[in-house]
Amino acid sequence: QKLCQRPSGTWSGVCGNNNACRNQCINLEKARHGSCNYVFPAHKCICYFPC
């Protein structure tokens, strides 16, 4: 199943913790996965959802 990226709607500020970002995406936003990705000009928490 293809996953599409979407910036986290509940994360604020710079993303410096992959585990915290992933947990927040999964628990709060019902995403499949999450990670800190560099999106100019800073790292952001990106959630991955089924497309």
UniProtKB/Swiss-Prot annotation:
InterPro entries: Defensin_plant, Scorpion_toxin-like, Scorpion_toxin-like_sf
Keywords for the protein's UniProt record, in alphabetical order: Antimicrobial, Disulfide bond, Fungicide, Phosphoprotein, Pyrrolidone carboxylic acid
Modified residues (Phosphoserine): S8
UniProt superkingdom: Eukaryota
SMART domains, alphabetized: Knot1
Cysteine pairs bridged by disulfides in the record: C4-C51, C15-C36, C21-C45, C25-C47
Keyword Iron-sulfur (UniProt): no
GO biological process, one term: killing of cells of another organism
Modified residues (Pyrrolidone carboxylic acid): Q1
PROSITE patterns in the record: GAMMA_THIONIN
Alphabetical list of Pfam families matching this protein: Gamma-thionin
Subunit structure: Forms oligomers in its native state.
Protein family according to the UniProt entry: Belongs to the DEFL family.
Function of the molecule: Possesses antifungal activity sensitive to inorganic cations.
Listed name of the protein: Defensin-like protein 2A
Organism annotation: Sinapis alba (White mustard)
